Amino acid sequence: MENTTRRLPAPNARRCAFTGYRPCKMPFGYDEDSPLGRDFRKRLRETIEVLILQGYRHMISGGAQGMDIIAAETVMDLQKRYPDVTLEVAIPFEDQAKKWPEEYRARWQRCIDAADMLTVISHEYTKNCLYARNRYLV
């Protein structure tokens, strides 16, 4: 898996990066269809839309389970309304999703496939690749 650019963000585009809790630490766990999960997605969408309206045009997801993937999916949906918004997925290593539950692997792959840019920090897992990805995000 190589770094891929399908579409570059506009020059000097304001950027916002997303990373956060994994499902096991989310108040709704893996049940995103629960009332808490639906409320979280609604509030996240509203927040990202406010950022877009404030001029943020390049969104970066860390690609992890939980917040990262939910944010990427939200951006993908908002791109229908705001086609000038770009999505970058920055993953710490190529096989990041290899040991994940099948549903999350499929969601991860959809995010990778839809991303305007894919940034691969390391070809294989290293003890520092997650820190390097986080540094890249900020």
What are these regions (language model features)?
Residues 2-138:
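Acidic/glycine-enriched connector segments
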